[in-house]
Amino acid sequence: MLKADLRRQMLARRRALTHDELAQRSLALREQLFRHFEVARWHWLHVFLPVARQHEPDTWLIIHQIWRECPTVQVAVPVVQPDGVRLRHCHLTPDTPLVENQWQIPEPVSALEVAPATFDAVLLPLLAFDELGHRVGYGKGFYDRFLLECRPDVLRIGLSLEPPVTQIDDAWAGDVALHACITSEQVWQF
């Protein structure tokens, strides 16, 4: 399938999820992450904050478990820059105040900026992924550009509410592939 078709199809599927279904899948994603990855060994994790109107996975479940059980792991979140093209990355603590930006993405008001080369792992938002590790996001390229700024050994993990499609037909060389993708049913390794 083509990315544009996958975006439409997966957004429709996501919006059809009930609150309870989304909550159950989000819990399962958290359980899979902590079961299959040594989260406590990471120093810095970059994670997206969920946009409620998009029915994104509730990454707060992951963040709160890290704060409770992995006190040495620091969390950073993206902040969309005014140019609408780039991200910067800010340290998130339990006391960090957040506001929603123009796209209703929660972002830190004022927080320590963290360089992309700092991260050991990145949890990536996506609408779809394929069996080769390619992902389909919202189409702005934020994460492809960001991942190129990270260390080559950064672990790239997608969080998906749906299983993979066989192949994304218009994946291209500039797409940064995943190392793994977590679904509520299993972890896909690439």
Where are each of the predicted segments found?
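Short glycine-rich anion-binding loops that position phosphate/pyrophosphate groups of nucleotides
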Residues: 50-53, 127-131
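A residue-level signal for conserved active-site and pocket-lining positions in enzyme catalytic cores
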Residues: 10, 47, 75, 123, ...
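N-terminal active-site beta-alpha-beta segment that forms phosphate/nucleotide-binding
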Residues: 1-114
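Short Gly/Thr/Asp-enriched flexible loops that form oxyanion-binding sites at enzyme active sites
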Residues: 57-64, 133-147
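Internal, well-ordered alpha-helical segments in soluble enzyme and binding-protein domains
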Residues: 6, 29, 142-143, 177
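Short, surface-exposed, charged loop/turn segments at secondary-structure junctions
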Residues: 91-94, 137, 141, 172
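Surface-exposed, charge/polar-rich loops and edge strands
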Residues: 1, 12-15, 112, 117-122, ...
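Short, structured patches in soluble enzyme cores that scaffold and shape functional sites
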Residues: 49, 79, 91, 107, ...
